[in-house]
């Protein structure tokens, strides 16, 4: 990673640390400190069900320089009709913990995807897929809270072996994606 960042420094690549409750704090601190010494912006990706986001962020911000930027990515992963209320509840808990520290140098990004693994649940040849991530973002939209999504893809990596690929056109509108 460091070689890549140094080689393409002019591209303003923002290194990201993925954090969950099982991570070693020492490894995270070492990575953040190494990037802070270089004055680079940092992104930290958290699952929305993390228990102590404020403790992790306190560690991160304690190593940051004055003008360094931090992007806190709250990753909702797959959002469906069956889990949207849980996603919103988890985001509310974590936003309440981080909202007091948000400013021009510390931004929150609410990310996720509602694009399904297969569109068959929405119709065989054509259909509409609700864009839940847009709906969720609108609930939390305010200064220093940014929108993020998975660019209309599903979070699962699917290996296609044999079979017939069926081309499809996806069109993203304000609240739905329709496909043909």
Feature names for model-found ranges:
Residues 161-180:
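C-terminal structured domain segments
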Residues 2-165:
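Eukaryote-skewed repeat-based solenoidal scaffolds used as protein-protein interaction platforms
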């Amino acid at each position: 990673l460091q070689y890549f960042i140094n080689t393409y420094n002019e591209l303003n690549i923002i290194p990201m640390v993925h954090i969950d409750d099982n991570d070693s704090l020492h490894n995270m601190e070492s990575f953040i400190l190494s990037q802070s010494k270089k004055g680079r912006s940092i992104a930290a990706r958290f699952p929305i069900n993390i228990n102590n986001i404020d403790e992790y962020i306190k560690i991160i911000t304690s190593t940051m320089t004055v003008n360094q930027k931090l992007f806190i990515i709250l990753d909702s992963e797959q959002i469906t009709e069956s889990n949207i209320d849980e996603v919103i509840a988890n985001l509310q808990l974590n936003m309440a913990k981080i909202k007091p520290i948000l400013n021009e140098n510390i931004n929150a990004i609410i990310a996720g995807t509602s694009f399904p693994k297969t569109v068959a649940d929405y119709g065989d040849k054509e259909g509409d897929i609700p864009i839940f991530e847009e709906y969720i973002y609108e609930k939390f939209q305010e200064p220093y809270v940014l929108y993020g999504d998975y660019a209309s893809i599903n979070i699962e990596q699917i290996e296609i072996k044999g079979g017939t690929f069926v081309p499809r056109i996806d069109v993203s509108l304000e609240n739905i994606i329709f496909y043909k």
